[in-house]
Amino acid sequence: MEASWLENRWARPLHLALVFCLALVLMQAVKLYLRRQRLLRDLRPFPGPTAHWLLGHQKFLQEDNMEKLDEIVKEYPCAFPCWVGPFQAFFYIYDPDYAKIFLSRTDPKTQYLHQLMTPFLGRGLLNLDGPRWFQHRCLLTPAFHQDILKPCVDMMAHSVNMMLDKWEKTWTTQETTIEVFEHINLMTLDIIMKCAFGQETNCQINGTYESYVKATFELGEIISSRLYNFWHHHDIIFKLSPKGHCFQELGKVIHQCTEKIIQDRKKTLKDQVNQDDTQTSQNFLDIVLSAQAGDEKAFSDADLRSEVNTFMWAGHDASAASISWLLYCLALNPEHQDRCRTEIRSILGDGSSITWEQLDEIPYTTMCIKETLRLIPPIPSISRELSKPLTLPDGHSLPAGMTVVLSIWGLHHNPAVWKDPKVFDPLRFTKENSEQRHPCAFLPFSSGPRNCIGQQFAMLELKVAIALTLLRFRVAADLTRPPAFSSHTVLRPKHGIYLHLKKLPEC
């Protein structure tokens, strides 16, 4: 009798709990079903490749195969809907007129993508929106003024020559073929540490910050994998997965490096004040620290760490990829490499000194840089979440809430925009050809109010790196080990870039 009474006492609450759980599951299922039906309705006017009912276009997205995207761009020359699983869809665009309308608006960054990046980058320029983004943008813009960038030329040249000295030793003692991306990655990190944070780390020699470089690479892989794996869209499932655990540990490495940079610079500035040794110019970190000192409520410690994280990551990773791909393109096209070298020698001589003004006098080399950025854009896409409906040039509309992805790769390889888009042709960027082209046909640094704040710094770095390298070496591609693309947020070489080096005689 007593057991029966206990069973009856507990049966009702258990039944209620079970019914409640089933109701929650049913509500979630209905919500997902309605979401899918809404997306199907909104995207019905737009043709695209057939998607698997469960996986969507996941296989294509995870193949690191840009050729597949090229095929889609040929077949659908303006845009196409891209499904990530059954309940999430992006709208890809790669037409200049579509891009112009898209970039002229003030839609916020895609929340989901930047939620993935916030745990290790924080809330900096890359993923802020609205008044906070505007405040940070206004604050940081002076850090990229010409007067701040001019002294960076010597620091960049020093870092590049340090890398080239390593190559020269390798050339005299080993085979002439080396993997250059690893070296260039450390070199661009060295440049950022000097120019943006005022620190001499010798990371190219002593291996300092190798853990940071490794962490950024692995984090990029995890973020890209999670973005296109709808099973990992749920935070709890992702955190319980091996990749989720790895993500947390790698984030700690990033934060430790950032905190050390900030504290070291604070100490240096404090010592300078104590010694009455005030520096004449400020770097990126000095400007941010000054802003925080002026109003800690307006610019918190978290804001400070976020901006240092953002600039350190974006400033070295994308630059390293761009320089590596530039060398590879010139290695494949020796006639353009020779013409660049001749131009550089006529301006720089032996390269023992290099100035801001001289870098404005190498137009053909600049055209080769731009053609590389067209052929292999370091940031292959950018995304926004529509805050209000978007009417496209063909008259069709997308509703608020839709995620729109501007595929810069697709735009730069669109045969409706560029003749023979796979051919390396720097003459596309002569003044005459550039004036005849749609202003939104070439967007390596995006455009509009949210364009890349560091694009002038990046171009300066590319010019210094390629000028000094071509003065000392002739490069040729190792055709037995062609590079592959890695579909991170930055378009890096998946297994590095192998080049044959030939030391040139001194002028």
Swiss-Prot record:
Membrane topology reported for the UniProt record: Single-pass membrane protein
Keyword Lipid metabolism present in the record's keywords: the answer is yes
* Any GO MF annotation of the entry: iron ion binding
Pfam families from the xrefs? p450
The entry's note on the tissues where this protein occurs is:
Expressed at high levels in brain, mainly in neurons in different regions, including brain stem, hippocampus, cortex and cerebellum. Also expressed in cerebral vasculature. Not detected in kidney, nor liver.
**Enzyme Commission code(s) on record:** 1.14.14.-
Show the PANTHER family listed in the entry.
CYTOCHROME P450 4X1-RELATED (PTHR24291:SF63), CYTOCHROME P450 FAMILY 4 (PTHR24291)
Q: What is this protein called?
A: Cytochrome P450 4X1
Q: In which organism is this protein found? A: Rattus norvegicus (Rat)
Taxonomic placement: Eukaryota, Metazoa, Chordata, Craniata, Vertebrata
